[in-house]
């Protein structure tokens, strides 16, 4: 799951080129087209990108995830919208903030910050976390 993403209003080649332009380590993006069979865009033709991990040792899912949402936001213009209804029985927080554990990622994206600035805002928290997670990695 979550290897392929898109929306009816995105252009797959543009999205893939934009994401590949970041030069993110251990990942490449390929344009794709699909028609979801469930959920938000069920039955609608969508374009997007397929995320292909090329080197699991250098791949950074945290940075990649932020890059994906920032690209969809930036390229989607007025068509892009964060989920506004209740999620996991929580009504007072946007779903994206709940999943991220903070509103800082969304706020940075909305403010037009660069990917580097958004990610850099978490460096002090990430640095001690990375060694702790190492023993739990499967690959």
Please describe what each predicted stretch is.
Residues 122-126, 130-133:
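Short amphipathic alpha-helical coiled-coil/interface segments
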Residues 2, 6-121:
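Conserved functional hotspot residues or short segments at active or partner-binding sites
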Residues 135-139:
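Charged phosphate-binding loop/patch that engages nucleotide di/tri-phosphates or the phosphate backbone
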């Amino acid at each position: 799951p979550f290897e392929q993403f898109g929306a009816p209003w995105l252009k797959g080649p543009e999205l893939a080129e934009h994401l590949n332009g970041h030069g993110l380590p251990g990942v490449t993006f390929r344009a794709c087209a699909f028609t979801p069979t469930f959920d938000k865009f069920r039955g609608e033709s969508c374009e997007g990108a397929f995320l292909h991990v090329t080197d699991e040792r250098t791949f950074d899912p945290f940075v990649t995830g932020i890059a994906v949402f920032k690209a969809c936001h930036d390229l989607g213009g007025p068509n892009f919208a964060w989920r506004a209804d209740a999620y996991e029985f929580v009504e007072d927080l946007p779903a994206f903030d709940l999943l991220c554990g903070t509103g800082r990622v969304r706020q940075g994206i909305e403010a037009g910050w660069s990917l580097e600035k958004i990610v850099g805002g978490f460096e002090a928290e990430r640095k001690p976390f990375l060694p702790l997670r190492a023993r739990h990695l499967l690959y």
